[in-house]
């Protein structure tokens, strides 16, 4: 029915055709709508009859009128009959086409309103309040007027009654440019409600327009979407507001707790000060009592001495008045002895008296405590500690890290973190990261590669089980209740694996000495027992180290001590003991035979040209990467590098035909070799 209704709807008024005219272009138009089009083309005070043409609103075909005007056009009787039958077939009531159109127009306005609605049919003054609004009549009625105008008979039984709404809601919006026309379409170009005349003859005729229902659905969907987002945002804001309010409450509670804690701590300090005041005051009082008691005794002694002296002085003066020599001599000797004794006793008494006792032993100096009290403040995270690389020590598998802290008294514990150094990039990354230690991609894969030693109480720690000849990054975190801060990273490295020469492997014509660090040619050496590991054979004057290396990076040096015929290298355990090193696939060697220098492996020699007076050879073994490199240890000049997929543990091996060689092992890898291995 709705599809048929749309075919029977006038393109101007959007209602069912009323007295339709059949245009020459085969389209139809309501007579009144056609008349309004002519009126819109008239100038001021110009009669409608003067207009003799207009455009079809559907196809834009120009319709030329005769002298009779619109009356000269034929009536579309067939269309009118179809409309009449359609109206009869449609039950008049809420489901009728006209009512359906009105309902769609009123749906947005049927919400309850606080505006008071008066009866529009009342003769009373003032009018009574309306109880119903008839959508069909577009009028609001009071109870009496409703009964009078809408008896329970046809056709009034088909009228739709709703709760009273204002008249403006019933009649809908009117066009701003054509006051007698309702808006019935939407100009998309100007984003404005318009009427049919605006589209036909107004400034919107070339604009894109849309049906109100279409625009209504689109804008409603958009509004619903925006409303959903707004509601969601409001929900988030309400959640945030609740959290903020909760945070405010927590701030109040925590601040009150901290204030109470501050009062408690200050009361404890005051109590401690009062206790110390009482203790020190008691000591001062006790010292005063002791000193006064001693002084009182000294006063009594002085008085007693004075009394005896006064009596003695009186007797002496009386004796001096005696003129009889015999009597004077009889008493003078005794008095003289007593005077001498009294003088001596007073001399002994005087040094005991201290007239300048100022209680120096009870001197008070609270300057340090005053400074501490002046610095009283809430606890903060300790300052970052500093790693003292100059104090750190290392062996081939341990590193002892030392650090200092400015806030040593506020630090509860330290946390040591370390990992293998893989490049400068992960140092920068660690330094920029406050507490989380993660290396750059491809350098330090994850936080799992960092080892953590927690709860350290001292300012030093020894890490065991490290790889030899390897550089590590260390950082120290100082921790207390307020937080933690990490030190700048420090780079420390373990030494190479130390080893010595194995005398059991030395050729019979070689002597190992100097704590198994030197090997020399010795034709007069004593007989040595045969052993499977001993070098033998004509000219195979070799000796092996006492270690087999199967991982890591290691560096050692060989002092040639004036020898001009020797070989320095490495060999598998399976390498033949009767061949020169480098003559087989199981050994690699740098060789010198007087003025001829070469490197040798699997019987193949490659000449090299080192400095004429090479006195110290450096050997760098990187087992995991399969490289054996030789250097001039004094000038750091690279001589040669073997690249091999090492499949077995290798042993340092040495051959000497004249003079001696001395090894220096357990060295850290030099810095210029530690970053990148030199290539030939």
Curated annotation (Swiss-Prot):
SUPFAM superfamilies: B-box zinc-binding domain (SSF57845), Concanavalin A-like lectins/glucanases (SSF49899), Fibronectin type III (SSF49265), RING/U-box (SSF57850)
Tissues where the protein occurs: Ubiquitously expressed in fetus and adult. At 9 dpc-10.5 dpc, highest expression found in frontonasal processes, branchial arches and CNS. From 12.5 dpc to 16.5 dpc, high levels found in rostral part of CNS. At 14.5 dpc, begins to be highly expressed in kidney and lung. At 16.5 dpc, highly expressed in the mucosa of the hindgut and cutaneous region of the stomach.
Record domain COS: where: 320-379
Compositional bias per record (Basic and acidic residues), positions renumbered to this chain: 516-533
Catalytic activity entry: S-ubiquitinyl-[E2 ubiquitin-conjugating enzyme]-L-cysteine + [acceptor protein]-L-lysine = [E2 ubiquitin-conjugating enzyme]-L-cysteine + N(6)-ubiquitinyl-[acceptor protein]-L-lysine
Annotated PROSITE patterns: B302_SPRY (PS50188), COS (PS51262), FN3 (PS50853), ZF_BBOX (PS50119), ZF_RING_1 (PS00518), ZF_RING_2 (PS50089)
One Gene Ontology cellular component: centriolar satellite
Compositional bias segments (type: Polar residues): 484-498
Gene Ontology annotations of biological process type: negative regulation of microtubule depolymerization; positive regulation of stress-activated MAPK cascade; protein localization to microtubule
Keyword Plastid assigned: no
Residue stretches in coiled coil: 205-264
The protein's name in its UniProt record: E3 ubiquitin-protein ligase Midline-1
The gene coding this protein: Mid1
